[in-house]
């Protein structure tokens, strides 16, 4: 399984929305990217504000069946982490399930969505959108009310906006996804689990998490299992968390 088409868009409302609109045009796996996204959407309905050329927005569309499609965001976080290490030498941490942090601030957001397509919408696919903050100034995060956000430039990385977006998009395509999708499609998250755990900032920390009934639980995050669930040790036993918001003590102002 490999990405057979990459489309560059000078500007679009949202790469995820564009991919959904054009999903039937793509082959089994395709990607779209832009530096100018004007109507993005974050995880849990949060907005992702356009950075006017100072960020990279990249979406991969997959029609092929996956062993564990719900864990694609975790694979994506590893793919981005590797590319940022290669380009800038930074060591990002992953806040479960897929936020990438640098020095405790959010650098990358990832949003995956399921897609129905084809005759009577019987086809099933998945897309994964990635937003990487490259060179926004502090004033951008202040104006957007994103006190816990940051960019590579703010963290001291030497960002070249003329070349870096295309380099990162190519790297995500060739090395982030192409080299891993076959294994992921066949075996799911398990082959990537140890690498993910080594980068996961949740582990060993106190967390609070949403329960299915709308209440909250709390405990120590002790593992990420083979299905990508966060394992939390609570006073009443272990909880395996897969959906909802998880707050980590000491991160994003959580206490």
What are the residue ranges of the model-derived segments?
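N-terminal lobe of the biotin/lipoate ligase/transferase fold
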Residues: 1-90, 106-108, 115-116, 254-255
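Long, positively charged amphipathic alpha-helical accessory segments at protein N-termini or as interdomain linkers
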Residues: 65-67, 74-92, 102-255
């Amino acid at each position: 399984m490999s990405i057979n088409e990459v489309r560059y868009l000078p500007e679009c409302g949202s790469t995820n929305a564009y991919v959904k609109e054009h999903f039937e045009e793509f082959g089994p796996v395709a990607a779209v990217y832009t530096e100018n996204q004007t109507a993005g959407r974050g995880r849990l309905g949060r907005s992702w504000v356009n950075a006017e050329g100072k960020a990279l927005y990249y979406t991969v569309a997959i029609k092929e069946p996956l062993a564990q499609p719900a864990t694609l965001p975790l694979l994506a976080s590893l793919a981005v982490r590797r590319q940022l290490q290669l380009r800038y030498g930074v060591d990002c941490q992953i806040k479960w399930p897929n936020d990438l942090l640098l020095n405790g601030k959010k650098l990358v957001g990832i949003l995956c969505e399921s897609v129905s397509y084809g005759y009577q919408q019987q086809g099933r696919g998945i897309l994964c959108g990635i937003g990487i903050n490259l060179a926004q100034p502090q004033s951008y995060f202040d104006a957007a009310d994103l006190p816990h956000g940051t960019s590579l430039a703010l963290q001291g990385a030497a960002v070249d906006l003329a070349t870096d977006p295309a380099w990162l998009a190519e790297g995500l395509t060739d090395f982030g996804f192409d080299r891993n999708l076959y294994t992921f499609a066949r075996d799911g998250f398990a082959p990537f689990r140890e690498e993910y755990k080594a980068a996961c900032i949740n582990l060993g920390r106190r967390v609070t998490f949403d329960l299915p009934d709308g209440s909250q639980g709390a405990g120590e995050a002790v593992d990420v299992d083979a299905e990508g669930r966060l394992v939390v040790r609570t006073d009443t036993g272990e909880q395996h968390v897969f959906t909802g918001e998880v707050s980590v003590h000491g991160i994003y102002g959580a206490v």
